[in-house]
Amino acid sequence: MCSWVWAWQHWEWWAVVVEPLPCWLMNTTASSATPSGIPPQALAGLKVIELGQLIAGPFAGKTLADFGAEVIKVEPPAVEGGAGGDPLRQWRMLHNGTSVWWQVQSRNKQSVVLDLRTDEGRDTVRRLIDEADVLIENFKPGTLEKWGMGYEVLSRSNPGLIMLRVSGYGQTGPYRDRPGFAVVAEAMGGMRYLNGEPGRAPVRAGVSLGDTLAALHGVIGVLLALQARQASISRDAPKGLGQVVDVALYESVFNCMESLLPEYSAFGAVRQPAGSALPGIAPSNAYPCVDGMVVIGGNGDSIFKRLMIAIGRDDLATDPQLTRNPGRVARVAEIDAAIGLWTQARRVEQVLAVLNAASVPVGRIYTAADIAADPHFQAREMILPVTTPDGLTVQVPGIVPKLSRTPGAITRRAPDLGEDTEAVLSRLQP
């Protein structure tokens, strides 16, 4: 499953999962103070209202929150027969009724419960948006307009507002009203067709890449819009002008499809699935060892030569037909067989030692257990502990990217449902 269509129980709409700039500080009443001991953060002073659910919208909110933005997550109340809140609270493996994934997706956020089925709830969220820099929403296109909360309406009282709208197919076009899961958008964007073995049914990645790609494109769009807002400050627009950031999940996937379309356009070539190899680039594949698998990227000209010497195939290293990629692609089966013959006689650690010494890109195919035990992840602070309210310590992914002067940080655990409602609403301007 992934995050693109979800019905909040008993709600009459479908949710489609769909250096700080001075202008940010001018446009928010929230404190930009950084917790004690945490260096100044890049997005301190930025106020974000998150109306998103599940993966795409909340991942965008999480990324902004990791770098100091104040992210207020609006969630629906519990209703009879339902748990309430973002459905991701109930996804995958649960501890005391809450997903441990929640500690990743909603860290650094505040949770406010509002019933958007009511006039009072919608009025309150509009007041929150009036004081915000950014609104993240991933409802079905037209939902906010139906509530009287389209961008044209919201920007009248908050002209600097930046609205990130994430949906399956975008806010325009003939497919805009279709429900869209990440799995469908990955297929439409070209990714699914290429995954798997030739002649067999396409497979999907084990995570919702389409959702995450859409979220990251959304964050890029928000940062671009913030820069443009700062540049638009004038006497008539003292806080600058906001805009809509329209992100379609299928387009975010398609944007990462490399040479897929140019090759079809120029040569009529329809790229086909190639299993674990990277078609048209050689050698780059997964190879068996005595006790596992490794991935080797020997596709650079000089790297290929070092790889062949390392595995004792000087004849291939000096073969003039293999000095450039086109020649290697033509003989990729022969090259892969030579590499596989060498790796399958050795343990993973032996392969890693030899090829790392030869400066050949190589790596073990990691499981979660491998990741948790790897010293490089630890040294880069990519595995961080978070403690839940009942005392469970959960390891979560660290902050990406690493900023030298204004780094991101985990400053608070993911909130319980409605944990911050009273505090947030008490700060609203009358």
Predicted regions and their residues:
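Tryptophan (W) side chains
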Residues: W4-W14, W24
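N-terminal helix-loop segment corresponding to the beta1-alpha1 unit
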Residues: P22-P238, T387, D416, D420-P430
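Glycine-rich beta-alpha junction loops
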Residues: A78, Y169-G170, L249-F254, D291-M293, ...
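Conserved Rossmann-fold dehydrogenase catalytic segment
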Residues: Q171, G199-S208, Q230-V253, Q272-P279, ...
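Oxidoreductase and adenylate-handling cofactor-binding alpha/beta cores
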Residues: A215-L241, N255-A266, M308-D314
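Aromatic-enriched alpha-helical interface/lid elements that frame and gate functional surfaces
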Residues: A282-A358, V362
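An anion-binding loop in the catalytic cleft
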Residues: C289-G292, G398-P430
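A glycine-rich dinucleotide-binding beta-alpha-beta segment and adjacent secondary-structure elements
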Residues: A357-T411
